[in-house]
A protein has these predicted regions:
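HIT superfamily nucleotide-processing domains
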Residues: 1-141
Length: 141
């Protein structure tokens, strides 16, 4: 999809806590304030540049959101010339009251995998057509 859009995804039968852990939000500090942290993930979910924002003091929500905006703007206008998109993912952890956010420059990868390690697979009909077509091609050998 090549147009600006927002998408909210809810999971009925999936708990991302099985795959996403607090260590995914640790890394070299970009900004460190009392109750608010911005860092570069040293254990990214998908790789390279994942900016983590962690809000522990809800009184700093305005500043937190501004840091989110500035990080997204950086990825769009100052990061690399061929990047024109980003994803923002929100997380919580039951043992922690903090709000966790990951902002990731968007390249050609399924966003559900980028944020939650959920691989995208084709539905049964598409899979069957693919298998049939490839079988036909391989049987030509």
């Amino acid at each position: 999809i090549h147009h600006p859009h927002s998408q909210i995804v809810g999971f009925k039968d999936y708990d991302y806590h099985q795959d996403i852990k607090p260590f995914h939000f640790v890394g070299p500090s970009i900004i460190e304030e009392d109750g608010l942290t911005v860092n570069l993930s040293q254990r990214p979910i998908i790789g390279f540049y994942e900016v983590n924002l962690i809000l522990k003091d809800r009184g700093k929500l305005g500043k937190f959101v501004r840091y989110m905006q500035l990080t997204a703007d950086y990825f769009m206008h100052s990061f690399v010339s061929f990047n024109d998109s980003y994803n923002i993912f929100f997380y919580d952890f039951p043992a922690d009251d903090a709000l966790y956010v990951k902002i990731i420059p968007r390249f050609l990868t399924n966003p559900l995998y980028v944020g939650y390690m959920i691989p995208q697979i084709a539905n049964g009909g598409h899979s069957a057509r693919f298998i049939h077509a490839l079988q036909q091609r391989l049987h030509e050998v």
